[in-house]
Amino acid sequence: PGLDDKVLTEWNGMMLATLAEAAALLQRPDWLAAAIKNGEFLINQLCTESGSISIRRSWHQDGNPRAQHAALGADLAQLVDGFTRLAEATGHAIWITHAKTIADKLLSDYWDAENGGVFTTPHDGEQLIVRQKDVMDNATPSANSTAAFALYRLAGLTGDERFTHHADQILQLLSHIAA
C-alpha cells in the first residue's frame, strides 16, 4: 500500500493547541518542546511570505518536500488557536505575533463582511456558484467555531478589540443556527 505522508495544516494546528495546553497544565517540558517544534515547522514549511503571508493547506515529504494547495478558513482558524495557546504556554511574544498575522489574514481574506463569519475559501480563491461557510462542527470543529474561540483568546492577549468584535459577529451568526 502507498504511504500517506501529507501534513495537513488544520490538523497540525489542532495538535499544536492540544500539546501546548497539555504541556502547560501537566508541566511537561517535553510536550512543550514538541509543540514548539510543531509551531516552527508550521511557520517554516506551510506559511510563506512574498509580500504578504501565504498559507498552504498541506505539505508532502515525497522526496521533494513541498507545500501545496491554498489554505482553507479552518486551516487559518486552527493556526490562530494553536499559536495563541503556544504563546500562553511559553510566554514568548513571537507566537502572539504569528497568531495575529494569521488572524489578520483570516479576517482580510476569508471574512464575510455582509453576514459575518468565515468563508471556507479566500476571496481570491476559485469562484464557485456558492461560497461555502462551515457553521456546524463535524469530525473536526468548524472554521467559525474555532475562529470565534481563537479570536477571543487572541484579543485577551493583545487587547485588540477588532478580534473581539469579529468573534462576537461569529457567535451572532452561529446563534441563529443554535436557536
Where in this protein do the model-derived segments appear?
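Glycan-recognition and catalytic cores of secretory/periplasmic carbohydrate-active enzymes
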Residues: P1-A179
